[in-house]
Amino acid sequence: MARIGESADLLKCSFCGKSQKQVQQLIAGPGVYICDECVELCNEIIEERLAEASEETTGEFELPKPKEIFGFLDEYVIGQEAAKRALSVAVYNHYKRVRAVSTIGPAETVGDEIEIAKSNILLIGPTGCGKTYLAQTLAKRLNVPFAVADATALTEAGYVGEDVENILLKLIQAADYDVKRAETGIIYIDEVDKIARKAENPSITRDVSGEGVQQALLKILEGTVASVPPQGGRKHPHQEFIQVDTTNVLFIVAGAFAGLEDIISQRAGKKGIGFGAPLHRKDVNADVFGEVLPEDLHKFGLIPEFIGRLPVVTTVTQLDQRALMEILTKPRNALVRQYQRMFELDGVELEFEQGALESIADLAVLRQTGARGLRAILEEVLGPIMFDIPSDDEVGRVVITRESVVQNAAPTIVPRASMLRAEKSA
């Protein structure tokens, strides 16, 4: 019996190594022991981890005020003041609502008659005016998962193409498969005007990429628990699904809506017919877009249920030459600064004359490609010199002139030796 007592005294916690006599209680398992102190420590660690996870997934982040969001957008996006204001307020209200629901909890809101509905956003405006960039910048400021989807790739369930649930898979992937984090993210759906009904009156033929897609999007826009295939593609009954609640996902849908200005003008009585009809002007069209009503969107081809789930409607305007020049130089990550940084990595300075910047902006206006076309023009102008510079150690500075843009003339090259002599003489 003595031996049994001695062996009992030698029992130790498998985690901290303390003996049975040093702790209040020792819990035995199959070949292992754990003391009460280690159990308490484990509980504290678990509580801390759960608190951190709750903080990340329930919106307990620092929510910037609308003016702060607007200021951040102002650093990156030139112009579009009305759109930036509308987005700042809408995004602030959305995440304020998410935080309120997460803090109070759905169980405690049952008796409360006030339930704040979700306000998704519709962005209307021509291509290359910053619609996608606005949404990306918002997600960057809020540090939430962000996914971009193309509405033209979507089809109604059962037809060749992508199901609407694949949009949610992109958001889950952006959140590194953290579903809880994805459920408070932002989804940007572009080219939504391309899924407008092909005719104003419903047709007896199936419109699988138009009205059918709008119908399929209704539930996830409003808020539902969707079954998402983890590998994408079509659903089949024998696969497992990821369950995603879209109640707190903010949807920003956008499109160019070409021809919508005519519908608005006709409704408002601003458009003539025949030889007396006024010619289209971009500035006039921009003003007309600001007067859009739900009935105009319905006439364009969006179904009333779809319009009703997009209560915040804002517009972006065509960028003029002055705005394009500012985009080249003013934002924090301006295109000119990006290329100057790339040249610096090769030990070369890059300089643009004022005339060159004006010509680049003029070319973008002429091509009607907006801000998106600026990078393509810069690549055309800088491509040949970027090919030569890495192999030429004598180049110290490259100056882009108006002729470099307009006439494809070679830029002005300043040798490194000349720059050194100028520095010494100074």
UniProtKB/Swiss-Prot annotation:
Keyword Chaperone among UniProt keywords: yes
A GO BP annotation: proteolysis involved in protein catabolic process
Annotated positions binding ATP: P126, T127, G128, C129, G130, K131, T132, Y133
Single GO cellular component term: HslUV protease complex
UniProt-listed SUPFAM superfamilies: Glucocorticoid receptor-like (DNA-binding domain), P-loop containing nucleoside triphosphate hydrolases
Pfam families associated with the record: AAA_2 (PF07724), ClpB_D2-small (PF10431), zf-C4_ClpX (PF06689)
Gene3D superfamilies assigned to the protein according to its UniProt record, in alphabetical order: 1.10.8.60, ClpX chaperone, C4-type zinc finger domain (6.20.220.10), P-loop containing nucleotide triphosphate hydrolases (3.40.50.300)
MF terms (GO), sorted A to Z: ATP binding; ATP hydrolysis activity; ATP-dependent protein folding chaperone; protein dimerization activity; unfolded protein binding; zinc ion binding
Family stated for the protein in its record: Belongs to the ClpX chaperone family.
Complexes and interactors: Component of the ClpX-ClpP complex. Forms a hexameric ring that, in the presence of ATP, binds to fourteen ClpP subunits assembled into a disk-like structure with a central cavity, resembling the structure of eukaryotic proteasomes.
NCBIfam families: clpX (TIGR00382), PRK05342.1 (NF003745)
Function comment: ATP-dependent specificity component of the Clp protease. It directs the protease to specific substrates. Can perform chaperone functions in the absence of ClpP.
Protein name according to UniProt: ATP-dependent Clp protease ATP-binding subunit ClpX
Organism: Clavibacter michiganensis subsp. michiganensis (strain NCPPB 382)
Gene: clpX
